[in-house]
Design a protein with these regions (language model features):
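Helix-loop boundary and gating motifs at the non-cytosolic
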Residues: 4-65, 226-231, 236-253
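A membrane-interface helix-boundary motif in multi-pass transporters
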Residues: 86, 172-189, 368-392
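Loop-to-transmembrane helix entry
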Residues: 50-61, 151-154, 252-270
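A late C-terminal transmembrane helix in Major Facilitator Superfamily
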Residues: 343-374
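Intracellular juxtamembrane helix-capping segments at the cytosolic ends
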Residues: 131-144, 327-341
C-alpha cells in the first residue's frame, strides 16, 4: 500500500470517527433535553408555577433556540478559521449550560422564593445549549471533502434518531425518580463529550485536503437559500404535527395506551435506517433532490397512516414516514453545508436548526391553544402534515430541476466556447 493510499485510509477513519463523535454528542444532548421535558412539570410546581404555564416555558425555550441557533452558527463561521478555537468556544458555553442545567432541580427544591432564579437558569441553559447544534456540524462543511459530507451528516443525525427512539422508555424509567441524579449524570456526560470537540476539530483540520487559508467574508444568502429555509420550516412543521400530535391518536385506534412506548419508536427506527442509503443518493444527486423526493414519499406515508385500517398497516406507514423524515433531515444538513460553502456553513446550518425550533414552537402554540381538542380543527391537523410535506417537497424538486438546467446550460456554454 502506497503512502498516499495509507494517508487516505487514515483520513477516512478520522472522518468516520468525527461522524460517530457528532452522533454521540447529539444523542447525549437530545437525551438531556428529554430529561428536562420529563421533569419540568414537577420542578415548575415546586417553585409555584402552575401546570398550565409549563407549555409556555417550553415555548420560551423554542423561541430562544429560533434566535440563538442561527446566532451560534454565525459565530462558528467567524471562529472556525482559527484551529482549536471552535472547540474551546463550544466547551466553554457547554460548561455554563451544564452548570445551569444541574442547578435547576436544586434551585427548584428551595420552593417558590426561587421562581425568578429558576426561570433565569432555564434562559441561560437555553441560550448556551445552542452551541451544541450548528457549531459542531460546521466542521463537516469546512474541513471535509464534499463527497463525504452526506454520510457524515447521516452519522451525526443518527444520534438524534436514537434519542427519539429511546425517549419513550426514558420517560417510563425516570417518571418516579428524583430529578437531581439524572440532571447531574446527563450534564457530566454532555460536558465530557463536548470537551472532546477540540481534539476532533484538530483531526479534521489535519486531514483537510487543502491548506488553511484566511477566511473570506461570507457571501449574502440569495433567493434559493432563503426558499430552502422556508421549505425546511414547512417540512419541520409537517413532522411536528404528524409525530407529536397525530401519531399517538392513530395508534390508539388499534392499540392500548400502554402499548405506545413500544409503537412510537417505529417512526425513529425508519428514520435511523433510511438515512444511510439516502446519503449515497445525496452524494450523487444533491441534497435538494433528496429532500424533495423524501417530502413527497413522506406525504404518501402519512396519508397511509391516516387511512390505515389495521395496526400492521399503520406500523408500516409510520416506519416509512420516519424513513422519509430521516432522509429529509440528513439531506437538509448536507444541502445547508453545500449552500453555505462560501464561508457561511454555520449560518445556513444554524438556520436549519432555527427552522426546526420555529416549527416546534408553532406545534406547542397549537397545543397550548387547544386546537387538537376542537372538532372543527381536527381535519386541519390531520391533513396539514400531508400538505406540508407534499407542497414543500414539490417546491424543492422544482428548485433542484431549475438548478440542474442552469448547470447543464453553463456546461454547454463552456464547451461551445
Amino acid at each position: 500500500m502506497s503512502s498516499l493510499e495509507l494517508s487516505a485510509d487514515v483520513s477516512t477513519i478520522r472522518a468516520n470517527r468525527a461522524g460517530v463523535y457528532l452522533a454521540v454528542l447529539q444523542l447525549v444532548f437530545t437525551l438531556g433535553w428529554t430529561t428536562y421535558v420529563i421533569y419540568l412539570p414537577k420542578l415548575a410546581a415546586e417553585v409555584g408555577i402552575a401546570p398550565s404555564a409549563v407549555i409556555l416555558i417550553l415555548m420560551l425555550d423554542q423561541a430562544i433556540f429560533t434566535i440563538t441557533d442561527t446566532a451560534m452558527g454565525i459565530a462558528a463561521d467567524k471562529i472556525a478559521p482559527f484551529v482549536g478555537r471552535l472547540g474551546l468556544f463550544v466547551g466553554a458555553l457547554t460548561a455554563l449550560s451544564c452548570a445551569a442545567f444541574v442547578a435547576l432541580p436544586f434551585v427548584a427544591g428551595t420552593g417558590p422564593v426561587a421562581q425568578a432564579w429558576f426561570i433565569a437558569l432555564i434562559v441561560i441553559w437555553a441560550i448556551t445549549s445552542s452551541a451544541l447544534r450548528a457549531p459542531p456540524l460546521t466542521l463537516l462543511g469546512k474541513h471535509r471533502a464534499k463527497p463525504s459530507v452526506p454520510f457524515l451528516s447521516a452519522l451525526a443525525m443518527l444520534g438524534y434518531g436514537l434519542a427519539g427512539a429511546v425517549s419513550p422508555y426514558l420517560g417510563v424509567v425516570l417518571r418516579d425518580q428524583d430529578a437531581r441524579l439524572p440532571f447531574v449524570i446527563s450534564s457530566v456526560v454532555l460536558l465530557v463529550t463536548a470537551l472532546a470537540l477540540s481534539r476532533v476539530e484538530r483531526g479534521l483540520v489535519q486531514d483537510a485536503s487543502s491548506p488553511e487559508k484566511p477566511a473570506e467574508p461570507a457571501k449574502p444568502l440569495g433567493g434559493v437559500p432563503m426558499i430552502f429555509i422556508v421549505s425546511m420550516v414547512i417540512l419541520a412543521l409537517g413532522y411536528q404535527l404528524h409525530f407529536s400530535i397525530n401519531s399517538a391518536p392513530f395508534y390508539l385506534r388499534f392499540a392500548k395506551p400502554a402499548d405506545l412506548q413500544w409503537l412510537m419508536p417505529v417512526f425513529w427506527i425508519g428514520f435511523n435506517i433510511a438515512m444511510f442509503p439516502a446519503s449515497v443518493v445525496t452524494k450523487r444527486r444533491g441534497g435538494l433532490i433528496v429532500m424533495g423526493a423524501a417530502g413527497l414519499l413522506g406525504a404518501l406515508a402519512v396519508l397511509g397512516a391516516e387511512l390505515a385500517g389495521n395496526l400492521n398497516t399503520l406500523i408500516v406507514a409510520q416506519f416509512l414516514a420516519g424513513a422519509a423524515w430521516g432522509c429529509m433531515l440528513m439531506s437538509a444538513i448536507s444541502a445547508a453545508l453545500a449552500i453555505g460553502d462560501s464561508g457561511a456553513e454555520g449560518k445556513v446550518v444554524g438556520l436549519v436548526f432555527s427552522a426546526l425550533a420555529l416549527a416546534t414552537f408553532a406545534r406547542m402554540a397549537a397545543v397550548a391553544g387547544g386546537l387538537q381538542k376542537l372538532p372543527e380543527y381536527a381535519p386541519l391537523l390531520h391533513w396539514a402534515p400531508v400538505a406540508c410535506w407534499s407542497v414543500a417537497g414539490a417546491g424543492l424538486l422544482v428548485i433542484a430541476a431549475s438548478r440542474l438546467q442552469q448547470s447543464v446550460a453553463r456546461a454547454r456554454g463552456v464547451s461551445s466556447s
